[in-house]
Each structure stands twice: as structure tokens, then as C-alpha cells.
């Protein structure tokens, strides 16, 4: 598995529905980029300029919401992931 560096987190994005409740099929180019995902890897924490270590706010398995244009999509061993900075995560789902 990939291990994120710095203050980065690796997510597996939620897939968008292929059709609406009314049964209308949505074209791939009309779909919005998903803004939620499951945390699959986190860093060990980041170090501030004064040397203080800050532990990550999220843990593996958390369902999170993130900024719309955050992160970089990567493919690794046939799967798609999103690598983003922890600051781009806006909420953890209960």
C-alpha cells in the first residue's frame, strides 16, 4: 500500500450513482467529481516550524468530506486513489 508523506492522506473516493432516482442515466462527462471518500492511509503526523509534532486528525477507515478541487488522483496496482493534504478535509462523517 502507498504511504503518504508530509501532511497528506490517501482516500478511496465514493463512486457516483450511474442514474438518478427517476431512472435517468447520467453521462460520464456530466457527473460531478465525488467529494467524499474513505481514508485508506494517513501520515505519521507533521512537524511544525517550532519542532512540535501534530498527530493526524483522521484515521484509516474514516469517511470524510473534502474540498471539491482538492487532491491528485493516482492509480496504484489497478485501483484509483486520491492523495490530498489533510487541511483539504473539511469533515469526518459519523
Swiss-Prot record:
InterPro entries cross-referenced by the UniProt entry: Chaperonin_GroES (IPR020818), Chaperonin_GroES_sf (IPR037124), Chaprnonin_Cpn10_CS (IPR018369), GroES-like_sf (IPR011032)
GO molecular function, one term: metal ion binding
Keyword tags: Chaperone, Cytoplasm
Listed GO CC annotations: cytoplasm
Domain of life: Bacteria
Disulfide bridge positions per record: none
Subcellular location per the Swiss-Prot or TrEMBL entry: Cytoplasm
Listed GO biological process terms: chaperone cofactor-dependent protein refolding
One Pfam family this sequence matches: Cpn10
Primary site of residence: cytoplasm
Similarity-based family: Belongs to the GroES chaperonin family.
Subunit: Heptamer of 7 subunits arranged in a ring. Interacts with the chaperonin GroEL.
Cited function: Together with the chaperonin GroEL, plays an essential role in assisting protein folding. The GroEL-GroES system forms a nano-cage that allows encapsulation of the non-native substrate proteins and provides a physical environment optimized to promote and accelerate protein folding. GroES binds to the apical surface of the GroEL ring, thereby capping the opening of the GroEL channel.
HAMAP family, per database record: CH10
Protein name, UniProt field: Co-chaperonin GroES
Protein's organism: Lactiplantibacillus plantarum (strain ATCC BAA-793 / NCIMB 8826 / WCFS1)
Primary gene name: groES
Amino acid at each position: 500500500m502507498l504511504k503518504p508523506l508530509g501532511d497528506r492522506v490517501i482516500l478511496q473516493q465514493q463512486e457516483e450513482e450511474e442514474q438518478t432516482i427517476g431512472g435517468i442515466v447520467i453521462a460520464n462527462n456530466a457527473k460531478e467529481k465525488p467529494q467524499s471518500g474513505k481514508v485508506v492511509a494517513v501520515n505519521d503526523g507533521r512537524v511544525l516550524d517550532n519542532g512540535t509534532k501534530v498527530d493526524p486528525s483522521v484515521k484509516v477507515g474514516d469517511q470524510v468530506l473534502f474540498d471539491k478541487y482538492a487532491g491528485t488522483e493516482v492509480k496504484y496496482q489497478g485501483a484509483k486513489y486520491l492523495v490530498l493534504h489533510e487541511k483539504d478535509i473539511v469533515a469526518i462523517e459519523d
